[in-house]
Amino acid sequence: MKRVVGIGGIFFKCKDPEKINEWYKTHLGMDTGPYGATFEWKEDDDSTKKGTTQWSPFSETTKYFEPSTREFMINYRVEDLEALIVELKKEGVTILDEMATYEYGKFVHILDIEGNKIELWEPADH
């Protein structure tokens, strides 16, 4: 079973997400909006399928990264989240919540061995 197949997003804390978005737009040409920027790309094995990677600044006061005390969180794309959760539980990995399903995919949060919160995402188109 494949586990992680790519990076789904980079999330980080900052003092002023609006100013950060504007800076990256002005100086690096990123097409930023209220939630950061979305980078589109095509799947290697099927060029008709598009994938995305999200770049998102969060307020430095966000609770979304808890219980981690880090200033960042990485979202990893996976192929079969339900099966992966079963395996991670068997391996003793800390699973922070129940799998949530939205129109754009399934999500669950885990902790790595250093306490970094990780978001696992199975896109809806998989």
Please annotate each region the language model reported:
Residues 47, 64-66, 100:
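Generic marker of residues within folded, mature protein domains
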Residues 28-31, 75-77, 97-100:
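Short linear motifs in intrinsically disordered
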Residues 3-4, 55, 61, 68, ...:
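General secondary-structure edge motif
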Residues 1-5, 11-56, 90, 108:
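Core segments of cupin and vicinal oxygen chelate
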Residues 57-62, 124-126:
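A short, sequence-level motif marking secondary-structure junctions
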Residues 1-15, 34-36, 62-126:
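Vicinal oxygen chelate
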